[in-house]
Amino acid sequence: MRNFKSSLLAGAIIFASASPTLAEEDGMMRARIGLSSNDFTTLWSGGDLKTDYMSLNLGATYITPSAFYFDLGFKQDTSASWNTVELTDDFNDGKDEDYTRDDLTVTIGKVLDNGVQLFAGYQDSSATIALPEISWVQEGSVEEEEMDVSGFFLGVGKSFKVGEGSINLNLAYGIMDGTLVDAVGRSWDSTDGDGYSLGASYTRFLTESFSLNFEVKKQKYSYEYDTGGATILTSGDDEMTMIGANLVYQF
Protein backbone atom coordinates (compact mmCIF):
# COMPACT_ATOMS: atom_id res chain seq x y z
CA MET A 1 0.00 0.00 0.00
CA ARG A 2 1.40 3.38 -1.00
CA ASN A 3 2.22 5.76 1.82
CA PHE A 4 1.79 9.53 1.97
CA LYS A 5 5.35 10.29 0.93
CA SER A 6 5.08 8.09 -2.15
CA SER A 7 1.91 9.82 -3.33
CA LEU A 8 3.45 13.25 -2.86
CA LEU A 9 6.51 12.16 -4.79
CA ALA A 10 4.31 11.05 -7.64
CA GLY A 11 2.45 14.33 -7.86
CA ALA A 12 5.50 16.50 -7.42
CA ILE A 13 7.24 15.01 -10.42
CA ILE A 14 4.00 14.77 -12.39
CA PHE A 15 4.25 11.01 -12.64
CA ALA A 16 2.91 8.08 -10.63
CA SER A 17 5.14 6.31 -8.18
CA ALA A 18 5.01 2.64 -7.33
CA SER A 19 5.86 1.34 -3.89
CA PRO A 20 7.78 3.55 -1.46
CA THR A 21 10.35 0.76 -1.19
CA LEU A 22 11.40 1.38 -4.79
CA ALA A 23 11.52 5.12 -4.24
CA GLU A 24 13.70 4.82 -1.16
CA GLU A 25 16.04 1.94 -2.05
CA ASP A 26 16.43 1.45 -5.79
CA GLY A 27 15.40 4.67 -7.50
CA MET A 28 12.83 4.73 -10.29
CA MET A 29 12.72 5.21 -14.06
CA ARG A 30 9.58 6.37 -15.86
CA ALA A 31 8.58 7.10 -19.45
CA ARG A 32 5.56 9.04 -20.65
CA ILE A 33 3.61 9.79 -23.80
CA GLY A 34 0.72 12.18 -24.17
CA LEU A 35 -1.10 14.89 -26.07
CA SER A 36 -1.70 18.53 -25.24
CA SER A 37 -3.80 21.37 -26.60
CA ASN A 38 -1.81 24.60 -26.89
CA ASP A 39 -2.97 28.19 -27.32
CA PHE A 40 -0.04 30.47 -28.20
CA THR A 41 -0.08 34.22 -28.86
CA THR A 42 2.88 36.46 -29.54
CA LEU A 43 2.76 40.24 -29.92
CA TRP A 44 5.69 42.32 -31.07
CA SER A 45 6.33 45.82 -32.33
CA GLY A 46 5.14 45.49 -35.90
CA GLY A 47 2.90 42.43 -35.82
CA ASP A 48 1.27 39.58 -33.99
CA LEU A 49 0.59 35.86 -34.27
CA LYS A 50 -1.93 33.42 -32.81
CA THR A 51 -2.00 29.63 -33.13
CA ASP A 52 -3.99 26.81 -31.52
CA TYR A 53 -2.48 23.37 -32.03
CA MET A 54 -2.11 19.85 -30.67
CA SER A 55 1.30 18.51 -29.69
CA LEU A 56 2.77 15.09 -29.02
CA ASN A 57 4.51 14.90 -25.64
CA LEU A 58 7.36 12.50 -24.87
CA GLY A 59 9.49 12.29 -21.75
CA ALA A 60 11.53 10.27 -19.30
CA THR A 61 12.34 10.74 -15.62
CA TYR A 62 14.84 9.16 -13.26
CA ILE A 63 14.28 9.52 -9.50
CA THR A 64 17.13 8.72 -7.13
CA PRO A 65 16.66 6.91 -3.80
CA SER A 66 17.07 10.27 -2.05
CA ALA A 67 14.20 11.84 -4.10
CA PHE A 68 16.33 13.92 -6.45
CA TYR A 69 15.03 13.69 -10.00
CA PHE A 70 16.15 14.35 -13.57
CA ASP A 71 13.53 14.87 -16.27
CA LEU A 72 13.81 15.19 -20.05
CA GLY A 73 10.74 16.33 -21.98
CA PHE A 74 10.06 16.91 -25.69
CA LYS A 75 6.97 18.34 -27.40
CA GLN A 76 6.27 18.64 -31.13
CA ASP A 77 3.20 19.93 -32.90
CA THR A 78 1.12 17.33 -34.77
CA SER A 79 -0.37 19.87 -37.18
CA ALA A 80 -0.50 23.63 -36.73
CA SER A 81 -1.31 26.86 -38.52
CA TRP A 82 -1.31 30.52 -37.58
CA ASN A 83 -3.06 33.78 -38.29
CA THR A 84 -3.19 37.26 -36.82
CA VAL A 85 -4.68 37.73 -33.38
CA GLU A 86 -7.75 39.54 -34.72
CA LEU A 87 -8.19 37.12 -37.68
CA THR A 88 -8.82 39.99 -40.08
CA ASP A 89 -9.33 39.52 -43.81
CA ASP A 90 -6.76 42.24 -44.38
CA PHE A 91 -4.04 39.66 -43.71
CA ASN A 92 -3.62 36.98 -46.38
CA ASP A 93 -7.35 37.17 -47.27
CA GLY A 94 -8.09 35.60 -43.88
CA LYS A 95 -6.27 32.34 -44.71
CA ASP A 96 -4.06 30.49 -42.21
CA GLU A 97 -0.39 29.70 -42.83
CA ASP A 98 1.70 26.75 -41.59
CA TYR A 99 3.34 26.84 -38.17
CA THR A 100 5.72 24.24 -36.71
CA ARG A 101 7.08 24.14 -33.18
CA ASP A 102 9.08 21.91 -30.86
CA ASP A 103 10.02 22.35 -27.21
CA LEU A 104 12.85 20.66 -25.31
CA THR A 105 12.95 20.89 -21.51
CA VAL A 106 15.54 19.55 -19.05
CA THR A 107 14.70 19.70 -15.35
CA ILE A 108 16.49 18.69 -12.16
CA GLY A 109 14.85 18.88 -8.77
CA LYS A 110 14.45 17.65 -5.23
CA VAL A 111 11.24 16.47 -3.54
CA LEU A 112 11.12 17.14 0.20
CA ASP A 113 9.30 15.03 2.79
CA ASN A 114 6.41 17.51 3.07
CA GLY A 115 5.60 17.38 -0.65
CA VAL A 116 7.41 20.61 -1.49
CA GLN A 117 9.73 20.41 -4.49
CA LEU A 118 12.49 22.73 -5.64
CA PHE A 119 13.55 22.55 -9.28
CA ALA A 120 15.62 24.24 -11.96
CA GLY A 121 16.07 23.63 -15.64
CA TYR A 122 16.62 24.70 -19.23
CA GLN A 123 14.08 25.12 -22.02
CA ASP A 124 14.51 25.62 -25.76
CA SER A 125 11.54 26.36 -28.03
CA SER A 126 11.93 26.59 -31.81
CA ALA A 127 9.23 27.63 -34.28
CA THR A 128 9.00 28.07 -38.04
CA ILE A 129 6.40 30.51 -39.33
CA ALA A 130 5.39 30.19 -42.99
CA LEU A 131 4.73 33.58 -44.59
CA PRO A 132 1.95 34.46 -47.06
CA GLU A 133 3.08 34.25 -50.66
CA ILE A 134 2.40 37.92 -51.19
CA SER A 135 5.11 38.76 -48.65
CA TRP A 136 7.92 36.52 -49.93
CA VAL A 137 7.59 36.96 -53.68
CA GLN A 138 9.13 40.38 -53.23
CA GLU A 139 12.84 40.66 -53.97
CA GLY A 140 15.06 39.89 -50.98
CA SER A 141 12.36 38.23 -48.89
CA VAL A 142 12.15 34.63 -47.64
CA GLU A 143 9.31 32.09 -47.41
CA GLU A 144 9.33 31.74 -43.62
CA GLU A 145 10.44 33.31 -40.37
CA GLU A 146 12.14 31.43 -37.56
CA MET A 147 11.83 32.05 -33.84
CA ASP A 148 13.93 30.46 -31.10
CA VAL A 149 13.48 31.12 -27.39
CA SER A 150 15.76 29.52 -24.80
CA GLY A 151 16.82 30.05 -21.22
CA PHE A 152 16.87 28.86 -17.63
CA PHE A 153 14.18 28.67 -14.98
CA LEU A 154 13.84 28.18 -11.21
CA GLY A 155 10.71 27.01 -9.47
CA VAL A 156 8.91 25.68 -6.45
CA GLY A 157 5.91 23.40 -6.13
CA LYS A 158 3.71 21.66 -3.60
CA SER A 159 1.81 18.36 -3.81
CA PHE A 160 -1.32 17.30 -1.94
CA LYS A 161 -2.75 13.80 -1.61
CA VAL A 162 -6.36 13.62 -2.84
CA GLY A 163 -8.03 10.22 -2.59
CA GLU A 164 -6.16 7.73 -4.76
CA GLY A 165 -4.22 10.46 -6.52
CA SER A 166 -2.40 13.72 -5.90
CA ILE A 167 -2.60 17.34 -7.00
CA ASN A 168 0.52 19.39 -7.69
CA LEU A 169 0.74 23.19 -7.92
CA ASN A 170 3.92 24.88 -9.15
CA LEU A 171 5.35 28.27 -9.99
CA ALA A 172 8.53 29.04 -11.95
CA TYR A 173 10.46 32.15 -12.98
CA GLY A 174 12.45 32.10 -16.20
CA ILE A 175 15.14 34.20 -17.86
CA MET A 176 14.85 33.73 -21.62
CA ASP A 177 16.55 35.00 -24.78
CA GLY A 178 14.79 35.21 -28.14
CA THR A 179 16.18 35.12 -31.68
CA LEU A 180 14.03 36.03 -34.68
CA VAL A 181 14.99 35.50 -38.32
CA ASP A 182 12.62 37.90 -40.08
CA ALA A 183 10.96 38.05 -43.51
CA VAL A 184 14.11 39.28 -45.25
CA GLY A 185 16.45 36.82 -43.54
CA ARG A 186 17.84 39.18 -40.91
CA SER A 187 18.53 37.75 -37.45
CA TRP A 188 17.49 39.76 -34.39
CA ASP A 189 18.65 38.81 -30.88
CA SER A 190 16.81 39.98 -27.80
CA THR A 191 18.33 41.18 -24.58
CA ASP A 192 17.43 39.07 -21.55
CA GLY A 193 13.70 38.58 -21.28
CA ASP A 194 11.88 37.18 -18.31
CA GLY A 195 8.53 35.79 -17.29
CA TYR A 196 6.68 33.19 -15.30
CA SER A 197 5.01 29.81 -15.54
CA LEU A 198 2.04 28.62 -13.44
CA GLY A 199 1.07 24.95 -13.46
CA ALA A 200 -1.27 22.43 -11.90
CA SER A 201 -1.59 18.68 -12.40
CA TYR A 202 -3.52 15.67 -11.15
CA THR A 203 -1.95 12.20 -11.11
CA ARG A 204 -3.79 8.93 -10.45
CA PHE A 205 -2.54 5.34 -10.41
CA LEU A 206 -4.15 2.83 -12.76
CA THR A 207 -1.94 -0.14 -11.86
CA GLU A 208 1.42 -0.62 -10.14
CA SER A 209 3.12 0.31 -13.43
CA PHE A 210 0.73 2.70 -15.22
CA SER A 211 -0.71 6.05 -14.23
CA LEU A 212 -2.59 8.93 -15.84
CA ASN A 213 -1.58 12.55 -15.48
CA PHE A 214 -3.67 15.60 -16.39
CA GLU A 215 -1.98 18.99 -16.48
CA VAL A 216 -2.62 22.65 -17.21
CA LYS A 217 0.05 25.34 -17.57
CA LYS A 218 0.17 29.08 -18.23
CA GLN A 219 3.38 30.80 -19.40
CA LYS A 220 4.07 34.44 -20.18
CA TYR A 221 7.39 36.02 -21.21
CA SER A 222 8.46 39.46 -22.42
CA TYR A 223 11.55 40.48 -24.41
CA GLU A 224 13.36 43.60 -25.54
CA TYR A 225 15.30 43.61 -28.82
CA ASP A 226 18.42 45.64 -29.53
CA THR A 227 17.94 46.54 -33.18
CA GLY A 228 20.52 49.28 -33.42
CA GLY A 229 17.98 52.03 -33.92
CA ALA A 230 15.65 50.10 -36.24
CA THR A 231 11.98 50.56 -35.45
CA ILE A 232 10.64 47.34 -36.99
CA LEU A 233 11.33 45.14 -33.97
CA THR A 234 11.90 46.49 -30.47
CA SER A 235 9.93 44.22 -28.11
CA GLY A 236 7.90 41.04 -27.87
CA ASP A 237 5.43 39.34 -25.56
CA ASP A 238 4.67 35.60 -25.64
CA GLU A 239 1.77 33.89 -23.89
CA MET A 240 1.02 30.14 -23.86
CA THR A 241 -1.83 28.16 -22.30
CA MET A 242 -1.54 24.36 -22.35
CA ILE A 243 -3.92 21.57 -21.30
CA GLY A 244 -2.65 18.00 -21.60
CA ALA A 245 -2.92 14.35 -20.60
CA ASN A 246 -0.12 11.79 -20.30
CA LEU A 247 0.12 8.04 -19.86
CA VAL A 248 3.08 7.12 -17.65
CA TYR A 249 4.84 3.76 -17.39
CA GLN A 250 7.22 2.85 -14.57
CA PHE A 251 9.96 0.35 -15.26
Annotate the PLM regions.
Residues 35, 58-62, 106-110, 120-122, ...:
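Residues on the lipid-exposed face of transmembrane beta-strands in outer-membrane beta-barrel proteins
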Residues 22-89:
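Short glycine/proline- and aromatic-enriched beta-strand/turn motifs that initiate or cap beta-hairpins
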Residues 17, 62-66, 110-114, 160-164, ...:
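Outer-membrane beta-barrel strand-turn architecture
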Residues 31, 66-72, 114-118, 164-169, ...:
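Repeated loop/turn-to-beta-strand initiation elements of outer-membrane beta-barrel proteins
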